[in-house]
Structure formats: structure tokens, C-alpha cells
């Protein structure tokens, strides 16, 4: 079903239809399209286009469709729909009949796709932040283990000065820190909602676009309808961030390939990230790293292609803009995969400390120390530089290191050299002297490792903000609880109940907007239940639920509660939070009284899980 048939008297040529259709790649926006449609149905309700009964019917059908898509996303590809918007509308009409045709009132595919894409970018961006964090954390852990492992530092691929393996790791941690910052900034800039901008001139209905934006989890609505449907800055910015980060990953891969080579033999990669040769049985090839290096080009290509596509477009939507998605999807998928592989390479890495130390002692890497020694004796640096250069030539001629020259031989180059020169030519001295901030001295490296560890820990603690609920949150809580109750995931709660139990609720926040909630209901037996866990549409899969559950479990622990349980149809989620399966028959009868309100009470498919806080305390005390 096309969404634009009335103007045409002839059917589209099948070759044009195949050329024009985008469902084969924009099917990835299905969840976002459904979430956006639910929010739009609420907006239409607010201006009287839909009745409350119609809106509820549409929302239930869209939620059903969302679950179907989550279970089998590839079912979409079996359709001949033009794009994901057409497919969603087709499915909706098949569920609710002509009512489904009312949903597109006041909305254009132009603002619809712009909204879908921003929702997808926001969700994918959060996953990329997590991937960056994991990679940095893995590298910091390796750095902790190798603070004293000496490594030759290179310039022009020539041995230059000794560093440590930890210092080398932290150099890339800094690069990825900048990537994290750039991505965070990009996500803030795209945190505006274009829905309600229509085709280009805005919607003709008096919709509260700020409320609509907040319902979708955006910070605010966009300010200009023409810009809203024209804008693809966020696509190019995310590709740009990906390109810079892939550059860092490629440089990392190149370093590790060199260090892993037989000529260097500084590191050995695990079998899990290497492959062999079909002909040469001795080979162990660093394929994961080579692919990271190779895939960098495709991300650059996607960015260049997108910029060339947009550079001469007039304002508003043009069909050229359909080309934004394939490159974006591929670029961000590639970036995510490469970060995962890089972290995996560090997971099983072995560092040959003896070999790295041996290499660091070669190549006259202590020549700069001798020059600094001469400067300390009163010789101008430029002259000292020349003297040491001549000394290096002399040592090369004798086939020895600088520190292996006798005092008499060294004094042939400068008579200010004395016996104390040998102390400053050691590797330990070379490292120790670099004690300024950011240097390679043991103290500075230990400080840098500690600071990196603290930054990552602070980031983890502030990624999702959870706080006690307030009465000012009631409107949002009521909407979220009703949403998941309609989905059949939670029991319904009246507004009066929510007000009465507000002290038991915790909420997650994003830019001051509530994005998730749950309550901790305490029984008089020292037992507590997590209830009414729900995440705002568009925010699932971004750590909100985990953060709320952990917050409530910590609260229960502080209250000396012995056990926390939950009844759920998604046991996998709670098992990731350390909950274990239990039997519903072991729960007190009064726990199950609320089941009388459940529409599925006669065909219950909920699973009981629990976390025993007393056992955790005992285990921790044994460890201590």
C-alpha cells in the first residue's frame, strides 16, 4: 500500500518501485516509528482529533505490533510496502480497521522520518557510549597490570625514548576519552524533536510540540519547521565522530600489529582473535586488528558520501535524503563492532616484558639523557645535542651502547663528563626524570592510571540519574504505569494509589525529565517486592531499568530487608541484576492478593525471582 495514490492514474513501474522502495534498510526504524506514532496519537487526542477510546485502541494495537517486531524484526522484509512508515500503517489498519487511517492526520512522512531517525540515533548513540566506556575500561585494566613494563617509544618508527606499556595504553585511553566527549556533545545537539513540523510549514493542528517532545524523551522541540525536515546534521556529525574514533582504532590496530610481529615480539594476541593460514601451518595472523584497520575506510566513505549527498540540496525533504540511512547504519555498526573487537584483543593480551625491556635499551634511547646531563654541567643544549650525536656515532662504530663506553672514551667527546654519568644513562633514570604531569615516571604513570580509573567510575555512577519520586512526578508516573499496565506487563495503579505510595517510588531522569520508574513495596515479614517497573517509550535498552532496580535493591539493603523479589515475564533482565528464580508457592499469600486485579490471573505466565540480601552480606563478610 502506497501512501500517496490519489494523484496518480497509472501504477508505478515495478522497476521504479524496486528502485524507490527503502523498506529493505529502513525496517531498522520500526520500533522508533511505532514509538513516534504512539506519541502522535496522544497529541491527536489532546486536540480532539481522536477520542480517548480511539487513542487507547490505537496505542494498544501499536504496542502489540511493537512486541511482534521485537520478536521477529525480519518479518517486515516479507512485505512489499514502500517503507517502514507504510508498513506500520498497513499493520495498524489490519488490526484496528479504518481507525488506523486517522493516525497520520496532521503528520507528514517528512517530520515522521526525521523523528524516527533521531530516536534511532539517540538510542544507538547510548550504546556507542557504552562500547567506548568498555574499551577504555579494558585498556585501563591492562595499564594497571603493566605500570612497570618498559616499552620502547618510537618516532618515525625509530626507537626514540623509553616509555611504559601502561603509558602507551593510556595514550589511547585519552584518544577514546575525546571520542566519548564528542559523541556526548553530538547526542546533546540532536536532542530536539522535529515531530509536528509537517511536510515543511508545520502542522495545521494546535499541538503542544514541547509536550510532544518530552513524551518522546527529547529535551525540547525544534524551533523551525523548515529546518526540522531539512536537517541531517546529526547524521553527518555522528559519522564524523565515528570517523575520528575509527582513526584512533586504526592507529591502535597498527601499533598492535607491529608489536605482535615476529620482528618485535612485544605482545601475543589470544587465539580467540587470530586466525591461521590455509597453506602455512605456523601462521597466527592478527586478523581482528587488520580488519579494524581495513574497515576504517568504509566509515570514511560513508561520511564522504553523505556530505556529497546533502551539499547541494534545497531546503525541505528531497528523495536524495533517503540515502542517509544505509551509510549511517553501516558506519555506526562498523564502529561498534570495531570497538568490541579492540576490547576483545586486550582481554587476552600477553605482554613480553623481557623483550620490551631489551628493545628499550637498544637504539640509543638514552641519548637525550646524556644531552640533558651536559646541559646540567653548563653546556648549551644545542652544543650538547651535537656532542651526543658524535658520541652516538662513536658508540655505533664500536658496536656498543653509550653506557658501555668507558669514562675515558666518553671524555673524548666532552671533558665535563664524570663517573656520575652512568647513573643517568640507566632505563630507570630515563623514566624517573620524566616526572612532570603526563610524563612516564612511575609516580606520574601510577597517578594517570588512578585518575583514568576514577573518571570511568564517576562516569558509570552518573550515566543514569535515579532519585526518590516526588509528588510533582505524579503525571508522568501515572502515564508510565498505565502504559505498561495496558501492555499487560504491570498491574494498574490508580492516581490515588500512586499519591499514597509516592514514597516507595524511585525514578530515572534525563535532562530533568522522568524516563523510568519503579516502586519498592515492603511487607511486614522483612520481604520487599519491586513493582511497577516501567521505562518511557524510546528509552528502553539504555540502562534506565538496571539503574532503578539497583537503586531499589540498595535501598532495601539499607533498610535491613532480607529479601527482594519480583514477579515478571522478563526474567532474563532481572537475572542480569543478580536475581535468581524462586517458586511463587514460597511467597506469602498476601503477596499474591494483588493478582486478583490482573487480567491474566487465570493464565499467569509470570516468573518469580528473588535476591537474598542476607546471603550477600554473609558472602561479603567472608571475602573481607
Swiss-Prot record:
Query: A biological process (GO) annotation for this entry?
Result: arginine biosynthetic process via ornithine
Positions of region (Probable acetyltransferase): 467-624
Q: Does the keyword Aminoacyl-tRNA synthetase apply?
A: no
Q: A single GO molecular function, which one? A: argininosuccinate lyase activity
Tell me any Pfam family this protein matches: Lyase_1
Protein location: Cytoplasm
- Note the SS bond partners: none
The pathway where this protein functions is: Amino-acid biosynthesis; L-arginine biosynthesis; L-arginine from L-ornithine and carbamoyl phosphate: step 3/3
One term under GO cellular component: cytosol
Region (Argininosuccinate lyase) location: 1-466
Write down the InterPro entries for this protein, in alphabetical order.
Acyl_CoA_acyltransferase, Arg_succ_lyase_C, Argininosuccinate_lyase, ASAL_AGS_AcTrfase, Fumarase/histidase_N, Fumarate_lyase_CS, Fumarate_lyase_fam, Fumarate_lyase_N
Instruction: Tell me which PANTHER family the record gives.
Output: ARGININOSUCCINATE LYASE
NCBIfam families linked: argH, PRK12308.1
Q: What is this protein called?
A: Bifunctional protein ArgH
Amino acid at each position: 500500500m502506497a501512501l500517496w495514490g490519489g494523484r496518480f492514474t497509472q501504477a508505478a513501474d515495478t522497476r521504479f518501485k524496486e528502485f524507490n522502495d527503502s523498506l529493505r534498510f529502513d525496517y531498522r526504524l520500526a520500533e522508533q516509528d511505532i514509538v513516534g506514532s504512539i506519541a502522535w496519537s496522544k497529541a491527536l487526542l489532546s486536540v480532539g482529533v481522536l477520542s480517548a477510546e480511539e487513542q487507547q485502541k490505537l496505542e494498544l494495537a501499536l504496542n502489540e505490533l511493537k512486541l511482534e517486531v521485537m520478536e521477529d524484526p525480519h518479518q517486515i522484509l516479507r512485505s512489499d510496502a514502500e517503507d517502514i512508515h507504510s508498513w506500520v500503517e498497513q499493520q495498524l489498519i489490519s488490526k484496528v480497521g479504518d481507525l488506523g487511517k486517522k493516525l497520520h492526520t496532521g503528520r507528514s512522512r517528512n517530520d515522521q522520518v526525521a523523528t524516527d531517525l533521531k530516536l534511532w540515533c539517540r538510542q544507538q548513540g547510548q550504546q556507542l557510549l557504552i562500547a567506548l566506556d568498555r574499551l577504555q575500561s579494558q585498556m585501563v585494566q591492562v595499564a594497571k597490570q603493566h605500570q612497570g613494563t618498559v616499552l620502547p617509544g618510537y618516532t618515525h618508527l625509530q626507537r626514540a625514548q623509553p616509555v611504559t606499556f601502561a603509558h602507551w595504553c593510556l595514550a589511547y585511553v585519552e584518544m577514546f576519552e575525546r571520542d566519548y566527549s564528542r559523541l556526548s556533545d553530538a547526542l546533546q545537539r540532536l536532542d530536539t524533536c522535529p515531530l509536528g513540523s509537517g511536510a515543511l510549514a508545520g502542522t495545521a493542528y494546535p499541538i503542544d510540540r514541547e509536550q510532544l517532545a518530552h513524551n518522546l524523551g527529547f529535551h525540547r522541540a525544534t524551533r523551525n519547521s523548515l529546518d526540522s525536515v531539512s536537517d541531517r546534521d546529526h547524521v553527518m556529525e555522528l559519522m564524523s565522530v565515528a570517523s575520528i574514533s575509527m582513526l584512533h582504532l586504526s592507529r591502535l590496530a597498527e601499533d598492535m600489529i607491529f608489536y605482535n610481529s615476529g620482528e618485535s615480539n612485544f605482545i601475543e594476541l589470544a587465539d580467540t582473535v587470530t586466525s591461521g593460514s590455509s597453506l602455512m601451518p605456523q601462521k597466527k595472523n592478527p586478523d581482528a586488528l587488520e580488519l579494524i584497520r581495513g574497515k576504517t575506510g568504509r566509515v570514511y566513505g560513508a561520511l564522504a558520501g553523505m556530505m556529497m549527498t546533502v551539499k547541494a540540496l534545497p531546503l525541505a525533504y528531497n528523495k536524495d535524503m533517503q540515502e542517509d540511512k544505509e551509510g549511517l547504519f553501516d558506519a555506526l555498526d562498523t564502529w561498534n563492532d570495531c570497538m568490541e573487537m579492540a576490547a576483545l584483543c586486550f582481554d587476552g593480551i600477553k605482554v613480553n616484558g623481557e623483550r620490551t625491556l631489551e628493545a628499550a635499551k637498544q637504539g640509543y634511547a638514552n641519548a637525550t639523557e646524556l644531552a640533558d646531563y651536559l646541559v646540567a654541567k653548563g653546556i648549551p643544549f644545542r652544543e650538547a645535542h651535537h656532542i651526543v650525536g658524535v658520541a652516538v656515532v662513536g658508540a655505533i662504530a664500536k658496536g656498543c651502547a653509550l653506557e658501555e663506553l668507558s669514562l675515558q672514551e666518553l671524555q673524548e667527546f666532552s671533558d665535563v663528563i664524570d663517573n656520575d654519568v652512568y647513573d643517568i644513562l640507566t632505563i630507570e633514570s630515563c623514566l624517573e626524570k620524566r616526572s612532570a604531569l603526563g610524563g612516564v615516571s612511575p609516580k606520574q604513570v601510577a597517578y594517570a592510571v588512578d585518575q583514568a580509573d576514577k573518571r570511568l567510575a564517576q562516569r558509570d555512577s552518573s550515566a543514569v540519574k535515579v532519585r526518590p519520586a516526588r509528588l510533582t512526578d505524579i503525571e508522568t508516573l501515572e502515564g508510565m504505569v498505565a502504559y505498561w499496565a495496558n501492555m499487560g506487563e504491570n498491574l494498574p495503579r490508580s492516581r490515588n494509589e500512586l499519591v499514597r505510595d509516592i514514597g516507595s517510588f524511585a525514578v530515572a531522569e534525563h535532562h530533568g525529565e522522568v524516563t523510568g520508574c519503579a516502586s519498592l513495596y515492603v511487607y511486614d515479614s522483612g520481604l520487599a517486592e519491586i513493582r511497577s517497573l516501567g521505562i518511557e517509550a524510546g528509552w528502553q535498552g539504555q540502562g534506565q531499568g538496571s539503574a532503578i532496580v539497583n537503586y531499589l535493591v540498595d535501598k532495601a539493603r539499607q533498610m535491613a530487608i532480607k529479601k527482594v523479589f519480583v514477579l515478571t515475564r522478563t526474567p532474563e533482565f532481572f537475572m542480569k541484576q543478580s536475581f535468581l528464580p524462586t517458586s511463587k508457592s514460597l511467597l506469602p499469600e498476601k503477596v499474591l492478593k494483588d493478582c486478583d486485579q490482573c487480567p491474566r490471573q487465570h493464565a499467569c505466565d509470570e516468573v518469580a525471582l528473588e535476591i537474598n540480601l542476607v546471603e550477600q552480606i554473609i558472602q561479603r563478610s567472608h571475602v573481607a
